[in-house]
Structures are given as C-alpha cells and as structure tokens.
Amino acid sequence: MANPRDTLKLLREIEKTYPCTFIRGNKENYWIHHRKNSEEEWKTGTTTTGMLAYNFAQLSDEDIDFFEAMPISKEMRYGNLPVFTICHGSPLVVNQSLRPDYEYIDDVVEKFTTQMVICGHFHIQTSYERKGKLVINPGAIGVPLHSAGKAQFLILSDENMQWKTEFVTVPYDVDKTLEDMDKEELFQ
C-alpha cells in the first residue's frame, strides 16, 4: 500500500470519534522486529520484503510503539450477545493461518475460548465450523484474494441475540491505487 502515514492518520482520526480495537498482525510484527534488529537488511523492489522496507521507512517510532501495544487477539463483548474473539492469524499465534484445509486446524480450534473467532491472515472470505466453533475470515480490503480485485469485509449484526454474519464484496478504484503506487515509485 502506498502512503502508510495517510492510513495511520485516518485510523487515529476515526479512533477519536468511534470506539476502535486494533489487532496486531504479521506485518506489524515484522516492523517491530526490524526496529529491534535494524542491521538485518530488507530487499527493495516489488517483493514483499521491498514493500515492508518501503512502509518501515515511512513509520515513526510512535507508530511502531502503537503496533507493539496492540494485542494479537481480543475477546469482544457487546451487551448480552455471545462473546467472540478477533485476531489476525489465530488467537494463539499472530501468523498462524486458520485455513480450513490445514491439518492442524482441529487441534488449534479446540484451544479457542469462544465459540466464534474472526481471523485474517489468509485474506480469503470464508466461514466454517469445526469442533463446534465457528471460524470466519472477512477477507481483506487492501490485499483480498480470490475476489476479482474487489475489497472484502464482514458485517456483524444482532439477530435475536445471536450474531448474523454478512460477507460484503465491493469494487474500489484499482486505477487510483496503482497510480498512488506508481507515484511512490513502488514499481521501480
């Protein structure tokens, strides 16, 4: 993503008006690690590490402190509705994928403390039940996979004191995004 400073500024503005919960993901962990181990070199260019290096160069110590303070998971409570957990990878490990086809899923799911977990990390909208627990991935806004280039997210709503989930896929201005990336010379 081009202009991470703009994204962080927007998030901090939203946080002033609305209650927000931020969860640390693997990218934040990479930046935290890199600040502590700056002698490790990242490649530049169009690779994942190049994008990490580009973003890290834009971040301040205050930003990294903000990331470091984020939990990797959190139980969410809303009135009398069922408690659920949000996380990036899994509630246990920040970069552990909860893809339903992975062999270890049953063992991991058994350790969940809530009946519903909303995770990210693998960027594919999905919902499945294992061991009586519901695992949901809302997809992704910035790097959605299997979405025909559209942004994805999830809406949770109360339906008779139970959570109703609605997957949403919307178009966004891909050309503008590519233009922003080109201005930042991210294709060099």
Language-model features: where?
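Active-site environment of divalent metal-dependent phosphoester hydrolases
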Residues: M1-A2, K27-I32, L92, M116-E129, ...
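Core catalytic region of metal-dependent phosphoesterases/phosphodiesterases
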Residues: M1-A57, D61
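Active-site neighborhood of phospho(di)ester-bond hydrolases with catalytic His/Asp-centered motifs
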Residues: T21-N26, C87, M116-H123, V135-G139
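Active-site-proximal segments of metal-dependent phosphoesterases and phosphodiesterases across multiple
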Residues: W42-T46, N80-F112, P144
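Metallo-beta-lactamase
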Residues: T47-V83
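Conserved hydrophobic/aromatic beta-strand scaffold that supports enzyme active sites
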Residues: S73-E75, I86, S127, F153-I155
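Acidic, His/Gly-rich catalytic cores of divalent-metal-dependent hydrolytic chemistry
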Residues: Y128-Q188
